[in-house]
C-alpha cells in the first residue's frame, strides 16, 4: 500500500517551537492534560509547514540562550504575522519582543530563579482567573528593557518589570515565568486560557478518539502482512500488544525472550495472561542458560548491559528467522524517545524523526540494520501517562498498567558484581518480599519504584547463637513523577521492620538488610 493512501494522521492544535528548553516536553504534556493535542517541533519550522498544519495556537518555548547573542536560536519572523495566537514563554517571550522591535538586556543584578509572586497590572484574557500575588516559577537571567509597539505590560514581580505582556489586537502574548511547571500555582490556568480562551481549541484529544483514529491507520499501514513484537511485559509493549491485537488480530506474533533476569513469577504470569487468558499469540523463548553463561566472570555493569543487549539481538534474529518471515516490526516507541533521539529534528507534520531508523528499545538494545523490517510505532506520539490510560481503556489490568519501571537487563544489574543462578534466586525472593509488603501496606501506587539490590560482599551476623557470614540486601524505594529526579521514600518503620524480618528469615544466604536513603541527584535510582 502506498504511503499516500494511508489515512491522514491528525494535526496538532497547538505547536510548540522548541528553543532548547528542558521544559518543552512538559509544555506538551500539560496541554494534552487539557485534552488538546500538541506537538513539539523544531524552531526552524517553515511558514509553509505551519500553514499546512494550520494550528490554532503556537507556543514558543524557553531556552538556555540569550536572544541578543550571536547565533541565538530564532524562528521565521513572519510567524508573528500569520494571525495565529502565539504565547512566548521565557526565552520565547524575549525572542518575540526582540523580533518585533523591542529590546532585551541582561538582568544579572536582578536575575530571578525559583518562586516569585506576580502582581497583575491590568485585566487580560491570558491571566483570567489568576489570583493577584500568586506564586509563579521564574528561571531567567535576562529581562525586557523596552516593549515593541502595540504591547502592554500586564503583570510584574519585584525583580521583573515585564512578567507578562500582551498585544490583544494581534493575539501575541508572553510570560517570563514557566506556567508548565508544577510550582506555578495558576500555571495550568494560564495554559488553559491560551489554549481554550485565546486559541479556541476543542477538547477532543482523548483515549477513545485516539483508539478510533489509530486502529484504521494500523490496518491501512499493515494490510494483510505479518507483524512481530518483542514483548517484555512492561506497560509499553503490553499496551502495544493489546492495541495491535485489536487492530489486526492473528497477523500479530509476540516474541517473549526469557533471559532469566525477570522478577519472581513474571514469565509465568505473562504467558498465562497474554497467551491463555487473552489468546494473543506469544512465542516463549527460554534463553536463560544462554544468557547466564555469557555473564560468567563479568563484574562491570556496562559490560553486563552490552553483553545482554548483544545476546538479545542474536536470539531475536535467530527466532524471527525461524518464525517468519515478518514484514513489520512493532515497537513501543514513545514521544519522549522521539524527542530525545531526534532533538528538534522532528517532522512537524507527522511528529516522527526525520531520519527514521530502528530505535534502541530498552529490551532490544539496538536491532541489526539488516533485519529489513518496516516499523509500526503507533505509540510514538504518546507520553507514558497517556500509554497507561490507553492500556486501561484496552483492558490491561492494574498489575501491568501500574507496575513499577523495570530495567531491560533486569535483575542482572541489581546484582552488583558477577551474576549466577544462586544470586538470582536469592535476589528474586528478597525482591518479591519487598514488593509484597509494599502492596500489603497500600503504598505500591504511591511509590515510583521499590526493589532489592544484592551486594557483592558478605557481612557477619548471628542467627540461632551461631555466627553467619552472608550477603546484605539493599532496599531501594523512591518517590518521583517521571524518574528524572527522585527522593527516597519515607516508608513507616513498622513496614521496613517487617520487610527486614521476612528477608533475613525467609531468604537463604542473607543476614542483613539496609535502606538506601539517597536521592537523585546525587545518586541514581538503580545501583548499576
From Swiss-Prot:
InterPro entries: Class_I_gatase-like, GATASE, GMP_synth_C, GMP_synth_GATase, GMP_synthase, GMPS_ATP_PPase_dom, Rossmann-like_a/b/a_fold. One of its GO terms (cellular component) is cytosol. The keyword Phosphoprotein does not apply. ATP binds at residues 232-238. It comes from the Bacteria. The keyword Coiled coil does not apply. Transmembrane segments: none annotated. This is GMP synthase [glutamine-hydrolyzing]. Keywords: ATP-binding, Glutamine amidotransferase, GMP biosynthesis, Ligase, Nucleotide-binding, Purine biosynthesis. Its EC number is 6.3.5.2.
Amino acid at each position: 500500500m502506498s504511503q499516500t493512501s494511508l489515512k491522514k494522521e491528525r494535526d496538532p492544535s497547538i505547536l510548540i517551537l522548541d528553543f532548547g528548553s528542558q521544559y518543552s516536553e512538559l509544555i506538551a504534556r500539560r496541554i494534552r492534560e487539557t485534552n488538546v493535542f500538541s506537538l513539539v517541533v523544531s524552531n526552524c519550522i517553515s511558514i509553509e509547514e505551519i500553514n499546512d498544519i494550520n494550528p490554532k495556537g503556537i507556543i514558543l518555548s524557553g531556552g538556555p540562550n540569550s536572544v541578543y547573542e550571536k547565533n541565538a536560536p530564532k524562528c521565521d519572523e513572519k510567524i508573528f504575522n500569520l494571525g495565529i495566537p502565539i504565547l512566548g514563554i521565557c526565552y520565547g517571550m524575549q525572542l518575540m519582543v526582540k523580533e518585533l522591535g523591542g529590546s532585551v538586556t541582561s538582568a544579572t543584578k536582578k536575575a530571578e530563579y525559583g518562586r516569585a509572586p506576580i502582581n497583575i497590572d491590568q485585566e487580560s484574557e491570558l491571566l483570567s482567573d489568576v489570583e493577584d500575588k500568586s506564586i509563579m516559577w521564574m528561571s531567567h537571567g535576562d529581562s525586557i528593557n523596552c516593549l515593541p509597539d502595540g504591547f502592554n505590560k500586564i503583570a510584574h514581580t519585584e525583580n521583573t518589570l515585564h512578567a507578562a505582556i500582551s498585544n490583544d489586537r494581534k493575539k501575541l502574548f508572553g510570560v517570563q515565568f514557566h506556567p508548565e511547571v508544577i510550582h506555578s500555582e495558576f500555571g495550568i490556568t494560564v495554559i488553559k486560557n491560551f489554549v481554550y480562551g485565546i486559541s479556541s481549541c476543542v477538547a477532543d484529544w482523548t483515549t477513545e478518539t485516539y483508539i478510533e483514529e489509530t486502529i484504521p491507520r494500523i490496518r491501512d499501514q499493515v494490510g494483510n502482512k505479518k507483524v512481530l513484537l518483542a514483548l517484555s511485559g512492561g506497560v509499553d509493549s503490553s499496551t502495544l500488544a493489546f492495541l495491535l491485537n485489536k487492530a489486526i488480530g492473528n497477523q500479530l506474533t509476540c516474541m517473549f525472550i526469557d533471559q532469566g533476569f525477570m522478577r519472581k513469577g513474571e514469565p509465568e504470569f505473562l504467558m498465562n495472561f497474554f497467551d491463555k487468558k487473552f489468546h494473543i499469540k506469544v512465542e516463549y523463548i527460554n534463553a536463560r542458560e544462554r544468557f547466564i553463561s555469557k555473564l560468567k566472570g563479568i563484574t562491570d555493569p556496562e559490560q553486563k548491559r552490552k553483553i545482554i543487549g548483544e545476546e538479545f539481538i542474536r536470539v531475536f534474529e535467530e527466532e524471527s528467522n525461524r518464525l517468519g518471515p515478518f514484514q513489520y516490526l512493532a515497537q513501543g516507541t514513545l514521544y519522549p524517545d522521539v524527542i530525545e533521539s531526534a532533538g528538534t529534528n522532528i517532522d512537524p507534520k507527522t511528529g516522527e524523526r526525520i531520519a527514521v531508523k530502528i530505535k534502541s528499545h530498552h529490551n532490544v538494545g539496538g536491532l541489526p540494520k539488516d533485519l529489513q523490517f518496516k516499523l509500526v510505532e503507533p505509540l510514538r506520539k504518546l507520553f507514558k501517562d497517556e500509554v497507561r490510560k490507553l492500556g486501561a481503556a484496552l483492558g490491561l489490568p492494574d498489575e501491568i498498567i501500574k507496575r513499577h519501571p523495570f530495567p531491560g537487563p533486569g535483575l542482572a544489574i541489581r546484582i552488583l558484581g558477577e551474576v549466577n543462578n544462586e544470586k538470582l534466586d536469592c535476589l528474586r525472593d528478597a525482591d518479591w518480599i519487598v514488593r509484597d509488603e509494599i502492596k500489603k501496606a497500600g503504598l505500591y501506587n504511591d511509590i515510583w519504584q521499590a526493589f532489592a539490590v544484592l551486594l557483592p560482599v558478605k557481612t557477619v551476623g548471628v542467627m540461632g547463637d551461631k555466627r553467619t557470614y552472608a550477603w546484605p540486601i539493599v532496599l531501594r524505594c523512591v518517590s518521583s513523577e517521571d524518574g528524572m529526579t527522585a527522593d527516597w521514600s519515607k516508608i513507616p518503620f513498622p513496614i521496613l521492620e517487617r520487610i527486614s524480618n521476612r528477608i533475613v528469615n525467609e531468604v537463604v544466604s542473607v543476614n542483613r538488610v539496609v535502606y538506601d536513603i539517597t536521592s537523585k541527584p546525587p545518586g541514581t535510582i538503580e545501583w548499576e
